[in-house]
Amino acid sequence: NAVDPTVVPGNIAMTAQRVELANGTAVRADTTGGADAGAITLNVDTLKTQSGPDGRVLISSDSNCGSQCVGGQAGYITLQGIPGFTPPSTRLYRHVTAPDSEPNRAITYYFAREFDLRGTDIHSDAIGNAPGGIVMMRTNGQASLIDSGVSVTTQDFTINDNKPNGQPAQNQGFSRIDIMGRDIVLKDSTIKANAEVSDIGSCPLCQGGPSAGEIWLRAEHSFTADNSLIANTGHGRAQAGITKIIKDHYFSFGAVWDAPYPDAPIDTVKLTNSEVTVEALHEGLPGYLRIRGDTIILDHSVVNSQVNNVTNVLDSQGRLIDVVGAGEAGTVVTDGRSVQGSLLMSAKNLDITGGGIIAPTQGNRIANRIELHADVLTTSPGTRAGGTLAAPRILDVADPSRVVISSSSGSTGGAGMISITGVSGPIPDDVPYPPSSTIRLTGTDVLTDTSSIGLGGRIEMRARGPIELHNTNISANVTDLRPQSVNGQEQSGNIDLSAGNILMEGGGISALTRGTRSGGNVSLSAAQSVTVSDGAAISASSTGLGNAGNITINSGPRFLAQNASITTEANQASGGDIIIQAIDSIRFINGRLSTSVLGGPDTSGGNITLDPAVVTLQNSHVLAQAVQGQGGNITIIAGTFLADPTSVISASSQFGLSGAVNIQS
């Protein structure tokens, strides 16, 4: 321990082919004063730890001088191979200041053979206006953490600030956990990076920082987590951090730029009964979550990227950028960080059973984007709620076993976008990702929901082959306009699906407005066919004063609705239109196609347009209805029109002007 901030505390180094720590052993290089904590370096070929009757194994380099003093930086903890004995491994990376260059920055690692940690806690935590430290683990074999925990913490420290001794903080004051191995295995374990900036603490002018830190989990072959938690959390005005589960970085410093410079994917990532979270709980900037693998399996697990309120403080250049509404119309960057974060998963095969992927906001910051880039995406319901066994998350109250993919807003921030497309190598900025080959969702809820005055979140799915929806609900819900909106023209939650063919069996696709904001539009586009069956429903509706959205279906050669419904409806406002186009045939069997408005004389029902070569109606209804308002029109343009006696086509208004039925055949 050192009280004098000019005194450098002692470091600890162990060098041996085999190191075993057991039964309450502690390796500590802590400080309780203003000096930096010491560094701990274990140069080993094999490291094994095991808790015992006398307690858990502890490796710590903490700075803890309490809330009333100014502390030093938490130290570096390095577990690696033996320099001079272990052959060095040099890797080339791009430097972040020259992203388009060839690999030009060399970093040399010394890899141990194996880490087997059981009942062990490793932490480099700073409490009391101090920057956190770094924990690094390097092995070319397996890094196993069983019933173990790794943590780093930063408290009340400004990014790029100086330490109490006047020296710059290492790593700009960011804390980091960096684990490299051929295989990384977590079981009953935790990986945590935390940061806190208090409103009443010793850092009243910290500009939205520091970050909760960086968690880099880099595995050459596989990453496996079982009943484990990976959490990157910003408290107060601290930013959420960056978490990556990847094979290795594209850049030397782990930058988060994605489309032009994707990181290398792990062969296999599997999360079972686990949770990966990046969250700004209060007023910090959002974080980034990146998981890349050739195969990603989520088995009753939850991936979460949460935000709350904007900071409303100046950035390092004195600009007020992070304010309410920032990030809604496009990317806004402050101090190198976007004011809207993102959750990105990329895989050739993404398989989700139970649990889900969520990006909620409970405050006035817009929710983070969810980007799922997969050649093949498959979901199926589980048997229980997802998350860790000790703290499962119930994402669907009615049925916790369902998969949930959701970006929702419980206050004024607005929902983020959900995009499901294909995986890609480097592509220029602002160029769309290619489509997936197959999207197959079963027992799944895909949802953007804005319960107050925030903007609606868009949902898009694009596939070259099929989009199959089995007992799956896709919904985009909005509520009220904001007072500053002009002529009611603000983003609502639109739903866009495009594929080779689209199949719906049960479930539904819905765009709903509950208030003054207009509802979103629903668009389905297929190169070959659209089939809706088994009680499936496609709807655009309004229960408030905002108009219902439109439904547009371009089905390629064929459209079939069997035991299904396609409707727009408005209780108080005007309804939306329905347009279905097909090259060859549109066929309804025991189906319902309707637009209806239940409001006053100033409302009007939506129009219905069918435009194929052949229209066939079997025990089906095509209705454009109104109560006091004007009924919508029905237009059928077809070379052949066939309707059995039990089918009904009607455009009517009970007390207003009825619409017209126009069949051109």
Question: Could you say what each language-model-derived stretch is?
Answer:
Residues N1-S665:
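Extracellular and secretory-pathway beta-repeat/beta-biased strand scaffolds
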